[in-house]
Amino acid sequence: MAQVRNLLNLEPPSLFLEVESALRNVLGTADPAKQADSVLRLSNHYVSSPDALSPWQKAWAMNALLSYYHPLNQSRAYGVANRGVQLGFFEGIETLYDFGAGTGAGTIGILAACPEIRKVILSDHSTEVLKAANSLFSNLRSLKDAGIKWEARTETLEEGIVPVAPSSSLALFSYVLTEANAIDRFERFLKRGNQHSFEAIAILEPSTSADGRRLQRLRSVLLENDYHIWAPCTHADKCPLLEESDRDWCHDRFPPFLPVWWKNLEAGLPMKNQSLTVSYLLARKKAPSDSRKFVRVTGDPLHEKTKIRQLICRGPHREFISWFPSRFEKPAAKELKDFDLARGDLFLDDQRFWKDQRGAERGHEYRLTENEVYQIRASLDELAIKPSR
């Protein structure tokens, strides 16, 4: 897959290596087979009782969270945060409120990409999981050296956490809106009044069709409450994957940064993680300052004989771009033979891309020339994410 191939050369951020060392101290020399059993047990718990509370008071559940789910979720958050960095989403944000923080995986992923954040508030209803987060964050020397302050609270959305400095505060919801009644609670949270509103909101959800499509429906709720969608959407029109498809949903794909014990742990599991997917929304009260028009790649490359076709988003319609590398003149045919786009890639719009329209009403396809493919490739380089170390 293009996304994974393009990003496999990325090294893990230094903060992740520090987290890995801290987790090793907590986990000790656990038996990989027992760890795998704990992961499967927790996974089955969520499948059989999706609305039940997480059993963090159980040692086996905490072990599964720290050894398996935490590394995956901090990688997802890091990928999403880098999409935001690409657009300047975090500029002026100094305080991060992490609702349903768990062990702080979402916060760590964002801090790895955005070291400018000065303060973190971890909020969760579980004292057990916050105790684990406290232990983990206490062992992250780089946060202390950078002067980043953090605290843990057992407050919830219903208790009305109010940002001390709303104009420089971000509310993070990572894998919490899947819980029962969470969407209704989130809508009430948004309607508290401007004086209590967070400047920025980041939502990460599972990349299933149901969760992804439900998250996209929250776009309109955010827009109605005076937020601007920064990513992944490139426009404020209706979502084409909701309006013109019965099954498509918007999600991104990122590489996982995995700890040293992962290979032995994953050997005992049926699920493998060569790449990670996540659905997300980034919104701010402030409108994006970049007035340029962007196109977002929303599908993996489809190789259809000698044609490459990919789903893109630039407005309210479901659209594809396509090209035939074998039909290009030399040397373009050779240079572009293996070129395709990664899910989530962003490139600058140009009216010339849309002059050769093909396809059906619910899936317009636009055929690109070799010069237009070169132009898109150059745009990718111009807008490339430069991950923080």
List PLM regions with ranges.
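A short SAM/SAH-binding and catalytic strip from SAM-dependent methyltransferases
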Residues: S169-I183
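Conserved SAM-binding loop of SAM-dependent methyltransferases across substrates and taxa
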Residues: T103-E116
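C-terminal lobe and adjacent flexible extensions of AdoMet/dcAdoMet transferase-like proteins
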Residues: L265-R389
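N-terminal auxiliary segments of SAM/dcSAM-dependent transferases
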Residues: M1-D51
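Conserved SAM/SAH-binding beta-strand->alpha-helix loop
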Residues: S126
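Conserved beta-strand signature within the Rossmann-like core of class I S-adenosyl-L-methionine
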Residues: S197-P206
